A protein has these predicted regions:
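Short terminal alpha-helical segments
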Residues: 1-27, 79, 86
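Alpha-helix boundary/N-cap detector
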Residues: 2, 34, 38, 66-73
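Aromatic-residue detector
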Residues: 10-15, 42, 60, 72-75
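Amphipathic alpha-helical interaction modules
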Residues: 15-57
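Amphipathic alpha-helical binding modules
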Residues: 60-93
Length: 93
């Protein structure tokens, strides 16, 4: 299964350990651009279909998780923080 492109770019731009800024993505959400809407749709798709593996995430975000359950708990926390006004993500890799 392929990881959607816009989701991959959001990981590189906002969630990579060298540039960890989910608050910047959250700020961009307020502008509701077409790009942000694509990211949200693709983030929804990733959470539903679960194509991101621990190895993929480690390669693209430079962050390791022990298992996919922990990874997807973290991704759900990021989604809630960015798109639903949830708290800052607390799950760590």
């Amino acid at each position: 299964m392929t990881v959607p492109y816009e989701f991959m770019m959001a990981v590189h731009l906002f969630l990579h350990t060298d540039n960890y800024q989910p608050h910047e993505l959250k700020a961009a959400v307020a502008q509701r651009s077409e790009w942000i809407e694509r990211i949200q749709r693709q983030f929804d798709e990733v959470l539903q279909t679960r194509p991101v593996t621990v190895d993929w995430y480690a390669e693209h975000a430079n962050e390791g998780f022990d298992d996919e359950e922990t990874l997807y708990r973290y991704l759900n926390e990021v989604y809630d923080y960015v798109f639903r006004d949830g708290p800052w993500p607390v799950t760590e890799g």
